[in-house]
């Protein structure tokens, strides 16, 4: 039997729209993608809303996209799960929240809420903060609760933070500190950023600003500093995190929250996030008897109780391949490495048989418009070598550029990012063709195709647009579908029967 190879290349954040103005995908010169779309079967997929397990109209994201891609079924997301708990009131009897409340009362200490304050729905949601505050008011802890607000400006408008701050103040929150997500939610092991936030939260090592909070935020805007990049500052020194306190980390998505959560709960484990085995975490004050609740399970390193356990997904794509004794490779740079591993594997840290992983470090730049190529060239070099070795039966590869550079809001840089990916994609696919394999090309959500909003301001968030799906097999005809249909399609190309747990369907309508 001839060995078959199928490679999946994920063009992160590359959606489709008929709107051509300020559309980086349309404006970029992409001769190879143009060639693929002209010469090979292709279709469009839904990558947002209910089709990926999110509320109707909710934009997709990389975590959700990769979960659905790898699971081969619609994966109902934490956002949907938590929203449902608020509606049916089970949120207010959640055992873990009540344990945190009891801890505060027993120790006569403080309650802290921290997380990303926006309604972007990618990492957190403002409604969850409000529901928690309602619960704390019911338990007479409102006056002893402090909010540590991480401003967004990435999944939302760059200057929307001031409105979220006002909303929360009007709701009754006591905001003790503020910092942009660039510092608080770094996922590229920039521990100097995490250190700044940790020491602000615990040791008063940040400016204490007495101005009205909204005026302070406006001052940042006046200096050209958007929500994402607001530097740490304290508004209420009495609201710092101390021994015996309780913390509820309101982010439900783990990948950007896990480092700060580890620093708070298990600082000795911060080394686990560094490939060289040594972190630069240096918290001034280590906390004792801290009770930490995370909305979902962040990682094995985070010592917390988990408010909402995730549904266990069985027989995902990677497991099917491994159980058949086949070899697979996952490759991405730091920014998207968790997505081709943890998220593609159903939100689990799996050690699959015959599964290799290659992590390419992301460039150490403040924002990726400064290096729109990111690490795509290095990924391409390693991928080509691996494919041509003949060792592997399947490959999962992510090019982060359209999404990560698209998030900066800079059109020219995003165009360059897409052009880089186009040339790299050609090299990867030529290697696949050399081993007589087939390639699937997909995006996990939209972003780079819309670089401005309706008012002409930079649009740095994801979109709800359809995404492309291409199969380099001229003997098939494809039908439209959703991200959950990609894994069944890949199994179909490998002539492997999909497991019954995969409720997605092959997108191959018929053989020509």
UniProtKB/Swiss-Prot annotation:
Gene3D superfamilies per the UniProt record, alphabetical: Alkaline Phosphatase, subunit A (3.40.720.10), BPG-independent phosphoglycerate mutase, domain B (3.40.1450.10)
Quaternary structure, from the entry: Monomer.
List of catalytic residues: 62 (phosphoserine intermediate)
The protein's required cofactors: Mn(2+)
Binding-site residues for Mn(2+) 1, renumbered to this chain: 403, 407, 462
Binding site for substrate: 123, 154-155, 181, 187, 253-256, 336
Residues holding Mn(2+) 2: 12, 62, 444-445
Pathway named in the protein's UniProt entry: Carbohydrate degradation; glycolysis; pyruvate from D-glyceraldehyde 3-phosphate: step 3/5
Source organism phylogeny: Bacteria, Bacillati, Mycoplasmatota, Mollicutes, Acholeplasmatales
Family: Belongs to the BPG-independent phosphoglycerate mutase family.
NCBIfam families noted in UniProt: pgm_bpd_ind
HAMAP family (alphabetical): GpmI (MF_01038)
EC number annotated for this UniProt entry: 5.4.2.12
Gene: gpmI
Enzyme class, UniProt record, top EC level: isomerase
Protein name: 2,3-bisphosphoglycerate-independent phosphoglycerate mutase
Role according to the record: Catalyzes the interconversion of 2-phosphoglycerate and 3-phosphoglycerate.
An annotated GO cellular component: cytosol
């Amino acid at each position: 039997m001839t060995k078959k190879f199928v490679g999946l290349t994920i063009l992160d954040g590359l959606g489709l729209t008929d709107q051509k103005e300020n559309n980086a995908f349309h404006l970029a010169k992409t001769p190879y993608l143009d060639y693929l779309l002209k010469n090979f079967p292709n279709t469009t997929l839904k990558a947002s809303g209910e089709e990926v397990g999110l509320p109707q109209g909710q934009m997709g994201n990389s975590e959700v996209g990769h979960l659905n891609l790898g699971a081969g079924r619609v994966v109902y997301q934490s956002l949907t799960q938590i929203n449902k708990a608020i509606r049916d009131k089970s949120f207010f009897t959640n055992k873990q929240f009540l344990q945190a409340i009891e801890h505060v009362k027993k120790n006569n200490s403080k309650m802290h809420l921290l997380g990303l304050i926006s309604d972007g729905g990618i990492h957190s949601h403002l409604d969850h903060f409000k529901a928690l505050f309602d619960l704390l008011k019911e338990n007479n802890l409102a006056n002893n609760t402090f909010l540590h607000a991480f401003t967004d400006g990435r999944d939302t408008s760059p200057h929307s933070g001031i409105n979220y701050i006002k909303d929360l103040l009007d709701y009754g929150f006591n905001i003790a500190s503020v910092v942009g997500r660039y510092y608080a939610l770094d996922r590229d092991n920039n521990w100097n950023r995490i250190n700044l936030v940790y020491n602000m939260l615990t040791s008063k090592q940040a400016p204490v600003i007495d101005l009205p909070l909204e005026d302070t935020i406006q001052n940042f805007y006046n200096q050209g500093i958007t929500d994402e990049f607001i530097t740490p500052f304290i508004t209420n020194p009495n609201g710092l995190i101390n021994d015996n306190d309780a913390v509820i980390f309101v982010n439900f998505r783990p990948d950007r929250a896990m480092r700060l959560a580890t620093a708070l709960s298990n600082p000795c484990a911060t080394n686990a996030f560094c490939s060289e085995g040594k972190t630069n975490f240096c918290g001034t004050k280590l906390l004792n008897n801290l009770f930490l609740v995370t909305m979902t399970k962040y990682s094995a390193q985070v010592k917390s109780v988990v408010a909402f356990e995730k549904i266990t997904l069985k027989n995902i794509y990677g497991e099917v391949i491994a159980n058949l004794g086949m070899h697979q490779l996952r490759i991405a740079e730091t920014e998207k490495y968790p997505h081709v591993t943890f998220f593609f594997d159903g939100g689990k840290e799996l050690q699959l048989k015959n599964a290799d992983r290659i992590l390419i470090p992301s460039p150490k730049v403040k924002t990726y418009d400064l290096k729109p190529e990111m690490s795509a060239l290095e990924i391409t070099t390693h991928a080509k070598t691996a494919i041509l070795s003949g060792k592997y039966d399947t490959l999962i590869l992510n090019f982060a550029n359209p999404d990560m550079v698209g998030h900066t809001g800079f059109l020219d840089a995003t165009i360059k990012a897409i052009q880089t990916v186009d040339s790299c994609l050609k090299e990867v696919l030529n290697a696949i063709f050399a081993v007589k394999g087939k390639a699937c090309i997909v995006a996990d959500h939209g972003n780079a195709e819309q670089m401005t909003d309706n008012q002409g301001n930079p649009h740095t968030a994801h979109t709800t647009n359809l995404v492309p799906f291409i199969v380099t097999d001229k003997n098939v005809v494809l039908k439209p579908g959703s991200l959950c249909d990609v894994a069944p399609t890949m199994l179909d190309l490998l002539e492997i029967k999909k497991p019954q747990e995969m409720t997605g369907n092959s997108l191959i309508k018929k053989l020509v």
